[in-house]
């Protein structure tokens, strides 16, 4: 993930993007929905397997690894939706972000958080993804 865009309007104006991992954050539900729809615009949602994970669950690492490694019997592609509701980071969440960042997968990964501030995202989370 070499090019990071934190402006939703710039992202929504993009016609093509090559990234497979998206961090969607903010407190405006309508913009979150628009950003998700834009990231999924090129996908036929009837033909993808959807996996929903909660980053705060104790077995997140195991579930995430299973999601990216398992093959679907019926679908070619997989979209992994990851939700984070906490408003602050801890070492387990940072480890989870590192796990996601280091994952080498063709699956589309959408991480959604509404409670973590932009300051924390810019300072603590984006550098994790920039290093990979």
Residue ranges with predicted function:
Residues 13-18:
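Phosphate-binding P-loop
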Residues 1-9, 29-132:
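Non-catalytic interfacial helical region
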Residues 21-25, 81:
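Short hydrophobic/aromatic beta-strand immediately N-terminal to the Walker A/P-loop
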């Amino acid at each position: 993930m070499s090019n990071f865009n934190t402006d939703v309007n710039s992202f929504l104006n993009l016609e093509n993007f090559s990234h497979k991992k998206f961090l969607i954050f903010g407190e405006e539900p309508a913009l979150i929905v628009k950003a998700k729809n834009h990231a999924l615009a090129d996908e036929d949602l009837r033909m993808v397997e959807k996996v929903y994970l909660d980053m705060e669950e104790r077995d997140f690492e195991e579930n995430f690894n299973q999601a990216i490694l398992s093959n679907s019997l019926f679908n070619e592609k997989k979209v992994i939706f990851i939700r984070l509701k906490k408003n602050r980071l801890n070492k387990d969440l940072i480890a989870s972000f590192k796990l996601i960042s280091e994952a080498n997968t063709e699956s589309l990964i959408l991480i959604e958080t509404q409670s973590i501030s932009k300051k924390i995202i810019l300072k603590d989370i984006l550098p994790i993804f920039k290093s990979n």
